[in-house]
Amino acid sequence: DQDCLPGWSFYEGNCYKAFDEPKSWVDAEKFCQKQSNGKHLASIEGLGKANFVAKLVSEDQSETLREPQIHVWIGLRDQSERQQCSSHWTDGSAVSYECGLAYPFIC
């Protein structure tokens, strides 16, 4: 079904959109949930979807999302007691961001 709201992009059964208003991880997730049909921050499974999301960010017309090495929130999160979003890549290296920092995000 390709019935996405205006401004959203369809990929493999879901609709996605980049938002350039910086929010914390929690606030970005809440924002996404308020969108049509209780959406969430984007989950990225596989290279195809990773490339699609990267293209969404690179094609966005806002100044914020065109900055070099911009961080964006996605649905990856494993919260520790210190309020950090952390997980691990397949090579074992850590991925860690302060969840309270405000970044653009992808629903």
UniProtKB/Swiss-Prot annotation:
SUPFAM superfamilies: C-type lectin-like (SSF56436). Residues 11-107 form the C-type lectin domain. Keywords: Disulfide bond, Secreted, Toxin. SMART domains: CLECT. Expressed by the venom gland. It is found in: Secreted. Gene3D superfamilies: Mannose-Binding Protein A, subunit A (3.10.100.10). InterPro entries: C-type_lectin-like, C-type_lectin-like/link_sf, C-type_lectin/snaclec_domain, CTDL_fold. PROSITE patterns: C_TYPE_LECTIN_2. Disulfide bonds join C4-C15, C32-C107. This is Snaclec VP12 subunit A.
